[in-house]
Amino acid sequence: MSELLQAQSLFKSYRRRVVVRDVSVQVATGEVVGLLGPNGAGKTTTFYMMVGLVRPDRGHIFLQQRDITALPMHERARMGLGYLPQEPSVFRQMSAADNVLAVLETLPLSPVERQERQEQLLSELHLHALRDTKGHSLSGGERRRVEIARALAMSPRFILLDEPFAGIDPISVLEIQRLIRDLRARGIGVLITDHNVRETLGICERAYILHDGKVLTAGSPQEIVDDPMVRQVYLGDQFQI
């Protein structure tokens, strides 16, 4: 049975300006969902409320039917909610292998278990050839692979990806899409927010389109593209997947 990450009736205001109004979003394990919209639509604020970076004024976040609205990010992580920020999160002066090990050392594992898990993650993310490469020398796509390996070290049930396609070349985009498919195949639920609409819709089963702080529509990528209102306020008439 699928587990759920749910945002229910979220509201958020800044200086009396409502930026998110009655937004509900749901992600199941084993599916990839997009959270998209034009600038100022409220998608980033909604995303940050689900991550735990921003507290909603009203509404609730549920993880596996437990209300986590008031929990800090590290408690959400322990419950299975992973987060990859847009900004580089690898340690620049540490090797790729040591970046993964740094996360494993926070878990109650024996040295042998840590080493075995480290090698497993390096293998699964095709990082063996980069194991001794320092974080500052990694390309954008390589860095993303290390960051995903670090996130997987916590055995998450859900991973929230903030702008995963930003600042990487077209070949790396394909690699990141493949990695996201691998996450889905593992049964992990993935929520993506990104300004690269075509790349995001190309990997999602469903997407939510926010506009003026509200959910304008939700559906499959093709349903999103075919929606006249979405084309009017966001995609334009010439957009194709």
Swiss-Prot record:
A GO cellular component annotation in the UniProt record: ATP-binding cassette (ABC) transporter complex
Its function? Answer: Part of the ABC transporter complex LptBFG involved in the translocation of lipopolysaccharide (LPS) from the inner membrane to the outer membrane. Probably responsible for energy coupling to the transport system.
Protein residues bound to ATP: G37, P38, N39, G40, A41, G42, K43, T44
Q: Which family does it belong to?
A: Belongs to the ABC transporter superfamily. Outer membrane lipopolysaccharide export (TC 1.B.42) family.
> Could you tell me the Gene Ontology terms of the biological process aspect for this record?
transmembrane transport
What Enzyme Commission number(s) apply to this enzyme?
7.5.2.-
Summarize the subunit comment: Component of the lipopolysaccharide transport and assembly complex. The LptBFG transporter is composed of two ATP-binding proteins (LptB) and two transmembrane proteins (LptF and LptG).
Compartment annotation: Cytoplasm; Cell inner membrane
Please tell me where this protein is predominantly located: cytoplasm
Q: Name one GO molecular function term.
A: ATP binding
Where along the sequence do coiled-coil regions lie? none
Domain ABC transporter, which positions?
5-237
Species, as recorded: Acidithiobacillus ferridurans
SUPFAM superfamilies, per the entry: P-loop containing nucleoside triphosphate hydrolases (SSF52540)
Q: What is this protein called?
A: Lipopolysaccharide export system ATP-binding protein LptB
CDD domains annotated for this entry? Answer: ABC_YhbG
Q: What is the lineage of its organism?
A: Bacteria, Pseudomonadati, Pseudomonadota, Acidithiobacillia, Acidithiobacillales
UniProt keywords (A-Z) are: ATP-binding, Cell inner membrane, Cell membrane, Cytoplasm, Membrane, Nucleotide-binding, Translocase, Transport
Domain of life of the source: Bacteria
Note one Pfam family from the annotation: ABC_tran
How is this protein positioned relative to the membrane?
A: Peripheral membrane protein
